[in-house]
Amino acid sequence: TAWTFLKAMQKCSKKREARGSREAPETNFPDTTEESAQQICCTRDSSDSKSVPRSERNKKGIQCQGEGSSRGSQPGQFVGVTYNLEKRPTTIVLINDTPLNVLLDTGADTSVLTTAHYNRLKYRGRKYQGTGIIGVGGNVETFSTPVTIKKKGRHIKTRMLVADIPVTILGRDILQDLGAKLVLAQLSKEIKFRKIELKEGTMGPKIPQWPLTKEKLEGAKEIVQRLLSEGKISEASDNNPYNSPIFVIKKRSGKWRLLQDLRELNKTVQVGTEISRGLPHPGGLIKCKHMTVLDIGDAYFTIPLDPEFRPYTAFTIPSINHQEPDKRYVWNCLPQGFVLSPYIYQKTLQEILQPFRERYPEVQLYQYMDDLFVGSNGSKKQHKELIIELRAILLEKGFETPDDKLQEVPPYSWLGYQLCPENWKVQKMQLDMVKNPTLNDVQKLMGNITWMSSGVPGLTVKHIAATTKGCLELNQKVIWTEEAQKELEENNEKIKNAQGLQYYNPEEEMLCEVEITKNYEATYVIKQSQGILWAGKKIMKANKGWSTVKNLMLLLQHVATESITRVGKCPTFKVPFTKEQVMWEMQKGWYYSWLPEIVYTHQVVHDDWRMKLVEEPTSGITIYTDGGKQNGEGIAAYVTSNGRTKQKRLGPVTHQVAERMAIQMALEDTRDKQVNIVTDSYYCWKNITEGLGLEGPQSPWWPIIQNIREKEIVYFAWVPGHKGICGNQLADEAAKIKEEIMLAYQGTQIKEKRDEDAGFDLCVPYDIMIPVSDTKIIPTDVKIQVPPNSFGWVTGKSSMAKQGLLINGGIIDEGYTGEIQVICTNIGKSNIKLIEGQKFAQLIILQHHSNSRQPWDENKISQRGDKGFGSTGVFWVENIQEAQDEHENWHTSPKILARNYKIPLTVAKQITQECPHCTKQGSGPAGCVMRSPNHWQADCTHLDNKIILTFVESNSGYIHATLLSKENALCTSLAILEWARLFSPKSLHTDNGTNFVAEPVVNLLKFLKIAHTTGIPYHPESQGIVERANRTLKEKIQSHRDNTQTLEAALQLALITCNKGRESMGGQTPWEVFITNQAQVIHEKLLLQQAQSSKKFCFYKIPGEHDWKGPTRVLWKGDGAVVVNDEGKGIIAVPLTRTKLLIKPN
């Protein structure tokens, strides 16, 4: 009973006082399964309340009916005055400065003073007419008198009835003024509540309660009555406008459970940093002789909620057919589903347990939510005393640890694991799959396997995961394959034969062994001499630019981080690859932050061919490959440096397949052990040099890998769009292009021309001024190797001849391999200035025999048109000054300058780089953001102590900005109204700033029918676009500050520069892209209006499939999807993003 416990605690307290120590009491706890006495507690309402706290009572020497006060292991820590209801709850109060022993009666509405006590008062007031009291003995006559009551520093003046009754009664009228409460639950007033605040500018939830069925309503009322009687909830005040709906579910036991939807409230609460970053793992426990697992009952209901925050937790109990007004309540303790409940609970429990941890640093005490693990190496008696003391500390604060959930005998169930003193296991689980599984069933199965993989080495999920490919809805049926069933059976066999894993020994080093399964899953185990501590697995990424070694190197970092988190040390790694492979990866290793200590064993299967790839050209043969399509048929071709060519028709294949087959064909045909492969396919080059590594014999890349294995060294090079080797060209053209590739690949001052133009352009290496009648020799870094039976001819360009520049380059013989120099003479009337990068001469490769003639006919057409001689270039030098003026005024981007003034992009970039305001400052981190027409992002930025609200359209980059006087809801709303008046936004994305999430702004956006979402900077679906726009806008504002008097003027000029003076998509300005999009929207609306009366048709693509289907009739079209009748799957819904609507086809 509670009396036995209190007496035992008093006895232990006296023993500790006699010893002068702070040891735990040695008494046992009362059996909570037996009928325990109810208790009445006088507790404090707030920090300044002085009504009947136990600590105050002990200082005064006041006890209840001779009952001794009970202390726990911490002096000065008390729950309050506790009265066993087997005896009368009495206390001593001062009435008119007279100490009187009174009865606490929470069932009495009015306090009554006995006649005997009235006569003992030091001073008495006037008598007033009283009211009759109807009791067991009949009607009792009374009169009332004014009294002054003092208790623990609190004074109240009131009237009490005086009657001839056996004992003075303090009823609810005076008990309430004294701050006393009847508490039947564990809600502890000894625990100080934590302050909870709403985000600035937000309000509490006001969501109406939805109807509940009669059965659920009866269950809810029953639960509410119990919570109300236990003090866990209270009736809401009449002026409380907040509400969050409740719902009721039935548990497996048949009992009802009340839940509250607090999602809207959670959005408005100021949330701090998460303090529980993961579950503790048994592999990190240190082996100990004795263990105990405790469970804290009704954990949330023990901790009081901030009284100022309680109104926001209000909920409503409705009635059937509005039979009576709704009843409304608020939570007094932490509610389930509240975002801060876990944080407050764990933080509170952490502070309570901290003194225990400091006293016993050698004891392992793990706290995760309401589960506690205690491990020690002392005697069994000492361990038991530790548990008794720990339970006493918790009970003093109101936390009960029920005996029925106290685990003192192995095996112990803890966080899904089974613990024994010698080893640990994952709790036994049989993996089963239903006959016709859905996506949800498979995902649950994969979650169970992933959970068990840390305790059962070797579990795999690759084939099981493959069954979910193409499935989007949770209830969608999946095709359960034989491979998946076999993998499931193998996993069950491993679980059945799983052995217990070991605990961590801090005196020994750890070893991590990594292996690769036949399914290309990386598995690992962490070991010490006593055995395996834990295990894990990771599905390796294939065909994503991730080689096997790269996968494993990143896995090492993951395991090292995991190990440091669990035991504070990094293990030594035993890996299935060589040091050479690691060094090869380290050359590309920007993704490696550090490497742990590694023990190398052997090479990874299927990855040794990578060691044959080199970074520099070899001395062997060079082969140029290309693939293409002609009339729907793929063609692969290659040409070697010794003049050999080959073409092969491939049938109906993709362009990428043709490129890959050309490389495969070149490797197969050459006998050389050292080979240089040059391709213009970035796809093939990237895959071969970085992307492969997990391929087997079934892979289309396998022949290339096998051929690389047979070589000594292979060099792969990529050149962008080299000429010639295309599907419809002959072998002799391929040979010619080989030489052009060689010319184009040498030096930086040689540029390709149009396909129909001969030769290459030579560029000026640096700025040169050529006076009138002066001759200069201009060097270049261009080197060529003239092919056999050919010569090179350096000559002038017509655009240079217009200015009077005469080129005397001359002939380059077949054997010449030096740098090209160009002799230039100014025969004009003014000085000529040549700018770096300017095309001033050309190089043409000719055969020795070129006397063939061909008649002219009408088929001779040209990309040049009929402009003739001198029309290749424009005399753009004259436009440089105008372009410089343009950039000085508007800070226009290089591409816009080049387009508007017909100057080379190199010159435009030089103009921009000479501007001190337009120097590039780098860019922020990239994010994954939504981009679509009429989808905007907004953010506030600060410059010169002023606030700028920036809107940017995500598709075009068009910027609209305005100055705000204050960063509040009112100013933001006015700016949004102006923005909505000028444009037609459909959606807006902002951060979680107080002005954006304020209720007026949210309601305004709803009224304007603008979808509003929020996020975190540089996070997926965030406002990364507007962040970059803010940086650009600030740069442009600073560029214009020298020419303006106010920030407002500079802002407007900067907006003109950003929207009309820089390029966006396709070389157009953001303004042009935005206007084009709006015109297209209007055009599409007109087309839809015209097609409104006709039946709609569409092409569509089913998720998980690659081919388009249709055209087919649209049965129904909604805002986000269409319904069509598919031949294979029947009537289905297809997202609009996977459809192309059209009018009925002919």
UniProtKB/Swiss-Prot annotation:
Alphabetical list of PANTHER family matching this protein: ENDOGENOUS RETROVIRUS GROUP K MEMBER POL PROTEIN, RNA-DIRECTED DNA POLYMERASE-RELATED
Posttranslational mods: Specific enzymatic cleavages in vivo yield mature proteins.
Functional summary from the UniProt entry: During replicative cycle of retroviruses, the reverse-transcribed viral DNA is integrated into the host chromosome by the viral integrase enzyme. RNase H activity is associated with the reverse transcriptase.
Disulfide bonds: none
Homology family: Belongs to the retroviral Pol polyprotein family.
ZnF (Integrase-type) residues: 878-919
Pfam family, one: RVT_1
Assigned keywords, A-Z: Aspartyl protease, Cleavage on pair of basic residues, DNA integration, DNA recombination, DNA-binding, Endonuclease, Hydrolase, Metal-binding, Multifunctional enzyme, Nuclease, Nucleotidyltransferase, Protease, RNA-directed DNA polymerase, Transferase, Viral genome integration, Virus entry into host cell, Zinc, Zinc-finger
Gene name of the encoded protein: pol
Protein name: Pol polyprotein
The keyword Nuclease appears for this protein: yes
InterPro entries per the UniProt record, alphabetical: Aspartic_peptidase_AS, DNA/RNA_pol_sf, dUTPase-like, dUTPase-like_sf, dUTPase_trimeric, Integrase-like_N, Integrase_C_dom_sf_retrovir, Integrase_C_retrovir
Keyword DNA-binding assigned: yes
Active site, per annotation: 105
Span of domain Reverse transcriptase: 230-419
Region (Disordered): 13-77
GO process terms (BP): DNA integration; DNA recombination; establishment of integrated proviral latency; proteolysis; symbiont entry into host cell; viral genome integration into host DNA
GO molecular function: aspartic-type endopeptidase activity; DNA binding; exoribonuclease H activity; RNA stem-loop binding; RNA-directed DNA polymerase activity; RNA-DNA hybrid ribonuclease activity; zinc ion binding
Bias-annotated ranges (Polar residues): 29-41, 66-76
Biased composition (Basic and acidic residues): 45-59
Known DNA-binding region: 1096-1144
EC number: 3.4.23.-, 2.7.7.49, 3.1.26.13, 3.1.13.2
Residues binding Zn(2+), per UniProt: 887, 891, 915, 918
Domain Peptidase A2: 100-174
